[in-house]
Amino acid sequence: MPKLQGFEFWSRTLGGARHVVAPMVDQSELAWRLLSRRHGAQLCYTPMLHAQVFVRDANYRKENLYCDVCPEDRPLIVQFCANDPEVFVQAALLAQDYCDAIDLNLGCPQMIAKRGHYGAFLQEEWDLLQRMILLAHERLSVPVTCKIRVFPEIDKTVRYAQMLEKAGCQLLTVHGRTKEQKGPMAGTASWEHIKAVRKAVGIPVFANGNIQCLQDVERCIQDTGVQGVMSAEGNLHNPALFEGRSPAVWELAEEYLDIVRQHPCPLSYVRAHLFKLWHHTLQVHQQLREELAKVKTLEGVAAVSQALKLRCQEDMSRQQEGVRPADNLPAFHWICQPYIRPGPREGSKENSGGRSKRALEEEEGSMEGLSKNKLKKQLRNPHKTFDPSLKPKYAKCDQCGNPKGNRCVFNLCRGCCKKRAFRETADCPGHGLLFKTKLEKSLAWKGTQPGLQEAQQVRPVTPSGFSEVVGSALA
Ligand SMILES: Cc1cc2nc3c(=O)[nH]c(=O)nc-3n(C[C@H](O)[C@H](O)[C@H](O)COP(=O)(O)O)c2cc1C
């Protein structure tokens, strides 16, 4: 069957999806996607996957895609970050049988994307992007799509979108914030930019940014004319957003934990989800926040969830009629609701007390005083300095651009070093890889075994023969 394109792809393959769960590193994992789909999401994206790692590392492919196959988890778009046409296409070819389209991340504004040269840091490299999209469009059996951030100028954003469309992009998600609008500087997304793109291209467009409830979805579609709306933070705080419901926070937590039992994921993902889902409740019941941070098992998390449910139910039963929710919240803390991130200097209860780790980290650079955690660290080590300019700079792996191991003899990251050391039967003590030493030991041992010596002469040991000896070291 010929590959469907543009609007036909959106309406037939994606079922005309309007309610879309965003790609979210460590957060749009299978269990969360299934929860969101049960509550109105019609299309989900995987978290961003690193194309180069996906190509070279079979375990990464298994852990991040192949083991997460589930018939209810469709339609699904797999997102990659990449900056090389061949690598992008190789990764996409390995993923295309497990999804309905491949998305290129052109929106990540984080430092890690700057260092790895991907995401929004490719925004100015139109020639490279054209080549990446064109090659993917030609070689893949599924459509290629892009998720972009806007430029400050509407006309440049429009030309950018048109360039991607011309190269073969079949669906565009426009996050209406610029690369600089992140963390405490995120502000609001510009639907004006999104509307202008929608008018100027002939492919379906999803809007992203400022979506906190179902009314926002309807308003955004009306104002901008887009085909669908994507939500990240709104979905994390209320996965029933697309149903237009705001359930009790423990209800969705319990349902999510049940799904995680069937489709396990790292505990760090689960914890991060619950911190968001319970954001407002944990402001009130700080003890539970600490317990959640400390638990080490899924059953431990379930126990915290049970305790939180009881506390919330007590709070509900004590609630007097006519009393409004505290802190100008739209609903009481036990109801799933949006979290509006405070601006850079905005005064709020959060700014005076138990703020999130992330909020503290984001302001790190601009704070004159030190956070509680940093003060504690300084007490333990009086010579510790928190001046960002004195932080050691990450040196890059010569091969893939990830941070290299400090003591690596090859100047590579662990993954690349392991491959090279294996190929060359070498040691890298910095990474604890001892292929050469193990081979020598194994040969010495074989030398002491009379029966084996004979076999040795018939079959000389080469690096590939070596794999039989230490194959398990690579598992
Ligand atoms: C926890 C988290 C992880 C994210 N990871 C990704 C990602 O992997 N790929 C991507 O394109 N955007 C990622 N984003 C950005 C979102 O997809 C989205 O563009 C952004 O949050 C704006 O949407 P919102 O206003 O609905 O939050 C992430 C956002 C969050 C909150």
From Swiss-Prot:
Annotated region described as Disordered, given as residue ranges: 343-388
Designated gene of the protein: Dus1l
UniProt biased composition (Basic residues): 373-383
Function noted in UniProt: Catalyzes the synthesis of dihydrouridine, a modified base found in the D-loop of most tRNAs. Specifically modifies U16 and U17 in cytoplasmic tRNAs. Affects the level of some mature tRNA and thereby the total cellular translation.
Main enzyme class: oxidoreductase
One Pfam family it belongs to: Dus
Keyword Oxidoreductase set for record: yes
Major localisation: cytoplasm
UniProt cross-references to InterPro entries, sorted A to Z: Aldolase_TIM, DUS-like_FMN-bd, tRNA_hU_synthase_CS
Substrates-to-products reaction catalysed: 5,6-dihydrouridine(16) in tRNA + NADP(+) = uridine(16) in tRNA + NADPH + H(+); 5,6-dihydrouridine(16) in tRNA + NAD(+) = uridine(16) in tRNA + NADH + H(+); 5,6-dihydrouridine(17) in tRNA + NAD(+) = uridine(17) in tRNA + NADH + H(+); 5,6-dihydrouridine(17) in tRNA + NADP(+) = uridine(17) in tRNA + NADPH + H(+)
Gene Ontology molecular functions: flavin adenine dinucleotide binding; tRNA-dihydrouridine16 synthase activity; tRNA-dihydrouridine17 synthase activity
Protein name from the UniProt record: tRNA-dihydrouridine(16/17) synthase [NAD(P)(+)]-like
PANTHER family per UniProt: TRNA-DIHYDROURIDINE SYNTHASE, TRNA-DIHYDROURIDINE(16_17) SYNTHASE [NAD(P)(+)]-LIKE
Family classification: Belongs to the Dus family. Dus1 subfamily.
Subcellular compartments: Cytoplasm; Nucleus
Alphabetically ordered keywords of this record: Cytoplasm, Flavoprotein, FMN, NAD, NADP, Nucleus, Oxidoreductase, tRNA processing
Active site (record annotation): 108 (proton donor)
Listed SUPFAM superfamilies: FMN-linked oxidoreductases (SSF51395)
Residues bound to FMN: 23-25, 79, 147, 175, 208-210, 232-233
Keyword check for Oxidoreductase: yes
Gene Ontology annotations of biological process type: tRNA dihydrouridine synthesis
EC nos: 1.3.1.88
Gene Ontology CC terms: cytoplasm; nucleus
PROSITE patterns registered for this protein in UniProt: UPF0034 (PS01136)
Cofactor: FMN
